[in-house]
Amino acid sequence: MPFSTRRHAGPAGRSRHTRRIAVSAALLFVVLLFPHLLPNSPGRLGSLAETVLPWFGVLIPVLLLWALMRGSPLGVAATLAPLVAWCCLFVPVLTGAPRAAHAEFKALTFNVGGERTTPEEIAREVIATGADLVALEKVPVPDMARYKKALAGTYKHHATDNTLGLWSRYALRDVEPMDLGGRWPHAIRAVAATPGGDTAVYAVRLPSVRVRVNEGFTIGRRDEAATELADRVAGDRSARVMVLGDLNGSLDDRGLAPLARHLSPAQAAAGRGFGFTWPAAFPVVRIDHVLLRGLEPTSTSVLPDLGSDHRPVLTGLRRAA
């Protein structure tokens, strides 16, 4: 009698697959709605999951296809839970109409790291945006003089330190480099004489993060710097505060929660979509931010790839009502 090792699908097999699909769907539902329940040890996986949270949605069609291939109506029904959760979280982000209002001035943040263009080319692109305040991060130190020269005709005022630069059409005073506990300045604070009153502007680049097999999500130094920056912002007596820069993280990441408690993201109020900025060729996460206190964003947008590994963010602003 011939013997076959092939498994035949039957009620028992379908039931087993249904249970697996249902458990997977339940776990995905919990991760989407309650990512803060994921522990950050080992490897700070909780923060990593929060950083890429919208992308968990790609697992939903995978579960649905699995259920359909196994002929499991209950499995199909189980996938509805994470689908509804994802839609509740992110459909409003994707479909919300950005506000349209007159801007008193515009601000741009741009991590210019990368070797696909020149300081002069970037300067031309920056000037063409019409921005009044420009924060540039990761400026190669040998190129800083070229940036200053290329931007000088449009921006009469500037403050630079290490790889950070702040350029302005408005007068700057009280310039202060801030190391935030690191070996090099992670921020520059300056008071800009913006329309409607002074604004304390922070040009920021927090420490870089990596995902490594032996270490996990390496956000320790970034989180420490973010907490230090949040403390500085909380103690800033200026009525209007703006943080421009590369925070090397999503605001959904619990590591940036101290900043989110004191400042409001322009993207949430005046943007459309996720506003991903990195990597420039195919952005998958928003790590470049405009955070505000005492200012109202009238518009905000992620600009096209200008030759860096990040995309710039341009935001229109006016005094808060």
List each model region and its residues.
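Soluble catalytic domains of enzymes that build or remodel membrane lipids, polysaccharides, and related
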Residues: G113-I127, K138-A321
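N-terminal, active-site-proximal structural segment of metallo-dependent hydrolase catalytic domains
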Residues: P2-K148, A321
